[in-house]
Amino acid sequence: FADNAEEKELADYGMLLWGNANYNFNQATMGFNTDASFNYAFANGRGWNQQHLVTYMESHDEERLMYKNIMYGNTSGAYSTRDLATGLKRNEMAAAFWALTPGPKTMWQFGELGYDYSINTCTDLSVNNNCRLAVKPIKWDYLANTNRKGLYNAYAQFLKLRNNPSYTNDFISNKYTVTSNGVVKSMQLNGDSIKLVVLGNFDVNPATANVAFPSDGIWYSMYSNKYQSVVGGSASVTLQPGEYYVYANKNISTVTITDVLNRDMPELKIPVTITPNPLRTSATINYQLTESGQLSIHAYD
């Protein structure tokens, strides 16, 4: 939109500005360390006073992370970021940094499921730069894929945490530091209500790094049973390629996102309207569910 000095001033006046972090995040998910720093993706990294940078990893104007993972990802021996399951886990690692670093965010449709059709996909599924505006496949069937649903659940957990009313002020504060020039990247949130450390190895080989923590003591992994003992303000960690952790300074019980069971509930009355009625060839069905889940509608004449 403008140079950084002008955007900083506009942010001080209250304007929200786009923060395009597509290239850097994608370099990291593909396993390359060149141009893979996240520092400039967040307001503190730009020297802003206000957390008014709307950070995004994907958009209507940028290539899909998963598409480039599969097409161009880095490899080392048997480890390949071009593998679907591996690439999805790396997108999950990137999403942890994107979601849990303070400031507003934008996510693009189906990114939470690892959408892997190019932004230039044509209606015949070929890829051509002239097809930027072509209709893209709608992939609700991704939800049936265990690895894709795992990415979806991770997004849900990250957003559930940052939307917790107890921590709202921490996720709009400037009390964080992003260290992301190396292959092991980290984010430290030194909030008043919660303190977090996100760390991950974006290399395609094991890596060891000394990671700073906001305070000494026991830090609890939020999405596994691990914990990290910290002495002297930092800890040496060795991570496998694509391995990441979200540590908190207290043991927070997180609710696991699970699928709603498919079940028939004939006794449940669901408001339904069908227009027009009577109908000829097509109709619009409006309904309201009491809980989210898969729905099957059968119409009989």
Label each PLM-derived region with a short phrase.
Residues V231-I257:
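C-terminal beta-strand-rich structural cap/linker in extracellular carbohydrate-active enzymes
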Residues N49, S292-Q294:
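Short, small/polar residue-rich loop motifs at catalytic or cofactor-binding pockets
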Residues L261-L289, A299-Y300:
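Surface-exposed, proline-anchored Ser/Thr-rich loop/turn motifs
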Residues I218-Y220, S296-Y300:
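Beta-strand signatures of extracellular beta-sandwich domains
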Residues F1-E62, M71, G87-K105, G111-I194, ...:
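Active-site-proximal helices and loops of the catalytic beta/alpha 8
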Residues K68-L84:
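Short, basic, glycine/proline-bearing loop/turn elements
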Residues G200-F202, V211-F213, P276, N286-E291:
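Non-cytosolic beta-sheet module surface loops
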